Swiss-Prot record:
EC number of the protein: 6.3.4.4
Gene of this entry: purA
Binding sites annotated in the UniProt record for GTP: 12-18, 40-42, 313, 339-341, 421-423
Positions bound to IMP: 13-16, 38-41, 137, 151, 232, 247, 311
Cofactor: Mg(2+)
InterPro entries named among the record's database cross-references: Adenylosuccin_syn_GTP-bd (IPR018220), Adenylosuccin_syn_Lys_AS (IPR033128), Adenylosuccinate_synth_dom1 (IPR042109), Adenylosuccinate_synth_dom2 (IPR042110), Adenylosuccinate_synth_dom3 (IPR042111), Adenylosuccinate_synthetase (IPR001114), P-loop_NTPase (IPR027417)
Residues annotated for Mg(2+) binding in this entry: 13, 40
Gene3D superfamilies hit by this protein: Adenylosuccinate Synthetase, subunit A, domain 1, Adenylosuccinate Synthetase, subunit A, domain 2, Adenylosuccinate Synthetase, subunit A, domain 3
Keyword annotations of the record: Cytoplasm, GTP-binding, Ligase, Magnesium, Metal-binding, Nucleotide-binding, Purine biosynthesis
Pfam assignment, any one: Adenylsucc_synt
Name of the protein described by the UniProt record: Adenylosuccinate synthetase
Length: 439
């Protein structure tokens, strides 16, 4: 198992953190390949009978497992203040981070002006039209990636040379202040304060910085097992999602190679993570969205509030048209289905199997947002189940209707479900699922 990838197959918040946490004891390295502190991976574990919850935004979830090294790759945009706060919080739990966290010297940095510009942009969009507002997390992710691809960004390696950092920072801040003042009529930032603050980060972050691509290459040559994790979900990919209501990077499988510097030939497992229903945060088309009591019930029972922003998530029925699309884009050879327990108590479950558009039905997912807003989901209705399944550990102990639900998904997608999560805790997992399609 050279490299396995864990990928969100919907609009994010699928439960990737729990699955990475589950798989981490069997690997040597867990590596994050894109995104920034706009993603929140929630880990819930049991220690001596007590349940504890921890939300990670940047450090891979493998940090909770002794002997596992964690990597933040070059594809990540890094907020130095956020990463240092997260490290401090992890260490306060008695978990050793020293020597176990490696940060790419080529990762780009998120600066205060990125957050200021993002806030100004969102305010400007909102004043123009509610439909134009993308609904970002306010963490400066988009503007940081903008600078990266404009080749004006500041990278982690720049923190290590004070003269270079001061020169680049002053030039960038003066440029961004002109945009804030003249375009958005917003308050300018204090150049000297930001320069001094970021010069200090060098002393605190230096021990973690390395060429992570070279590190991973050597580790793979030595037979290391690597688990790569993305942030957000495939339907938020900047190229393959519902543009412009997307993130600014590539959560899809291809992002792993460019975000870590590993060869595609090293990848042998692509594991898609999907909820048993759908959720979405922020604006953008959502064909199976439920506005009534069922949607509210899913939100409350599933705790569907953003781990990063706290915003309520929009909830809807499982969309197999969309999931089939992300299976195609990523080449999943296995799925993990999460939050199956949340569906207990619903008499009838609807699953979207086709879209109706312009008088015709199709199984093709239209990535163009203007078309996606006009499709009408066509549903298959499946029987629900009443039983609380959160204590089930073997697939044969699930209610027949729950087993049929899993089999229906497998048959439609032609992808096996290898894992089923039926609760937030580490122990709430069913691993003997295959082959459900034959059930």
């Amino acid at each position: 198992m050279p490299v396995s990838i864990v990928i969100g197959s919907q609009w994010g918040d699928e439960g990737k953190g729990k699955i990475v946490d589950l798989l981490s004891p069997d690997v040597d390295i867990v590596a994050r390949y894109q995104g920034g502190a706009n993603a929140g991976h929630t880990i819930v574990w049991d220690e001596e009978g007590e349940t504890e919850e921890f939300v990670l935004h940047l450090v891979p979830s493998g940090i909770f497992h002794e002997g596992v090294t964690c990597v933040i790759g070059n594809g990540v945009v890094l907020d130095p203040k956020a990463i240092l706060e997260e490290i401090e919080k992890i260490e306060s739990l008695g978990i050793d981070v020293e020597g176990r966290l490696k940060i790419s010297h080529n990762a780009h940095l998120i600066m205060p002006y990125h957050k200021a510009i993002e806030a100004a942009q969102e305010e400007d969009r909102a004043s123009a039209s509610d439909d134009d507002e993308i609904g970002t997390t306010g963490r400066g992710i988009g503007p940081a990636y903008t600078d990266k691809f404009a080749r004006t960004g500041i990278r982690v390696v720049d923190l290590l040379d004070e003269d270079v950092l001061r020169r680049k920072l002053r030039r960038s801040i003066e440029e961004k202040n002109a945009i804030l003042r003249d375009v958005y009529d917003a308050e300018a930032l204090d150049v000297d304060r930001i320069v001094e603050e970021y010069v200090e980060f060098d002393q605190k972050i230096d021990d973690y910085v390395t060429d992570t691509s070279a590190y991973l290459s050597r580790a793979l040559d030595d037979g290391a097992r690597v688990l790569a994790e993305g942030a957000q979900g495939s339907l938020l990919d900047v190229d393959f999602g519902s543009y412009p209501y997307v993130t600014s990077s590539h959560p899809t499988a291809g992002g792993c190679c460019t975000g870590l510097g590993v060869s595609p030939t090293e990848i042998d497992r692509v594991l898609g993570i999907a909820k048993a229903y759908c959720t979405r945060v922020g604006n953008g088309p959502f064909p199976t969205e439920l506005d009534g009591e069922v949607g509210q019930a899913l939100r409350e029972k599933g705790g569907e509030f953003g781990a990063t922003t706290g915003r309520p998530r929009r909830c809807g029925w499982l969309d197999l048209v969309a999931l089939r699309y992300t299976c195609m884009v990523n080449g999943f050879n296995e799925l993990a289905l999460t939050k199956l327990d949340i569906l207990s108590g619903i008499d009838e479950l609807k699953v979207c199997t086709e879209y109706r558009y312009d008088g015709k039905t199709t199984r093709r997912f239209p990535s163009e947002p203007q078309n996606l807003t006009r499709v009408e989901p066509q549903y298959e209705t499946l029987p629900g189940w009443e039983a609380d399944i959160s204590a089930v550990r073997h697939v044969d102990d699930l209610p027949r209707a729950a087993q049929d639900y899993l089999a229906f998904i497998e048959n439609y997608l032609d992808v096996e479900i290898g894992l089923v999560s039926n609760g937030p805790r580490r122990s709430q997992i069913i691993t003997d699922v295959q082959p459900m399609a034959a059930a």
